[in-house]
Every structure is written in C-alpha cells, then in structure tokens.
Amino acid sequence: MAKRLGFIGIIIHQRKKCATAVNALLTEYGDSIVARVGLPYDKKKCSVITLIVDMTTDELGTLTGKLGQIDGVSVKSALSKEVV
C-alpha cells in the first residue's frame, strides 16, 4: 500500500493525564511524522498538536484509533487523494 501525505489534528483536554500516552504513540510513529507543531491554549484549558504525516491509510487508521482511545483526546485526520 502506498504512502500518502496527510495531517492529524489532536486536541488534548487533560494534558497532565494524557501527555505521556500521546507522546509515546507519536514516538512509535516518528518515522512517518514529517512535522509537528504543538501549542498550549490556556484560554480553553487544552493543548493542540498538528502533525504532517506520510503514511498508508492503514497506518493512519491505527495511529488515530489509538489516539482516540485515550481519555481526554480528540483526533481528526485526512490523507491526500493522490500518492505524492
């Protein structure tokens, strides 16, 4: 299966509770992460992480599924239609 360029948006509502689990998963998939930007948003008491990824649909589904199972984490993603 071909890899495609895409993004993952992660919102963390309970940073102290979730950060270790989220970072462990991102480290596990580090070879497929092209860029990462993470910002705390104190006004809403959450943190936002945006990832640019180069993954297959299966890899993306597995990673986002694991992230989505962590309490206090919301995740959305998309891949390009074409193989880049």
Go through each PLM region and give its residues.
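Long, contiguous binding/interaction regions
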Residues: M1-V84
